[in-house]
């Protein structure tokens, strides 16, 4: 019985820390740049909820859409990660040169996720499970199958 109480106490003590690290739910309107991005690329999908994360001078927004897509954006409305969770992302969110490369080389595949990495690299996950890594000039530099 004491072990059970200790476990419950530990879980309750740690939950606020985990919640703060992940950001807090927000009922404030999203910044205009983010709202414009969403209406441009995801006009047919509603926002389920969004969270704000503040780390030092780095403000981020995690937007969760009703279709399961998760989008992380900076305060300027630039996406840093878009994860469709096995749902195809709209081609309009994929950088044009990357979309052209995928259309020409993987015509039967769709993009499931985009992730901006360090040194201006973009990782693209395709519907076949392959991960393509592009440099800042949108040149393919690695394939992980």
PLM features: what roles do these ranges have?
Residues 1-10:
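Bacterial N-terminal signal peptides that target proteins for export
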Residues 19:
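Glycine-rich phosphate- or other oxyanion-binding loops that anchor nucleotides, phosphorylated ligands
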Residues 22-145:
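Interaction-mediating elements
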């Amino acid at each position: 019985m004491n072990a059970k109480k200790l476990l419950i106490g530990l879980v309750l003590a740690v939950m606020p820390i985990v919640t703060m690290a992940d950001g807090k739910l927000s009922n404030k309107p999203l910044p205009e740049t983010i709202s414009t991005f969403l209406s441009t690329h995801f006009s047919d999908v509603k926002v389920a909820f969004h969270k704000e994360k503040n780390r030092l001078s780095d403000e981020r927004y995690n937007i969760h859409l009703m279709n399961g897509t998760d989008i992380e954006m900076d305060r300027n409305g630039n996406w840093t990660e878009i994860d469709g969770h096995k749902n195809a992302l709209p081609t309009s969110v994929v950088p044009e040169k990357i979309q052209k490369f995928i259309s020409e080389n993987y015509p039967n595949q769709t993009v499931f996720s985009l992730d901006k990495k360090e040194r201006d690299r973009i990782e693209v996950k395709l519907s076949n499970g392959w991960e393509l890594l592009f440099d800042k000039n949108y040149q393919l530099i690695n394939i992980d199958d």
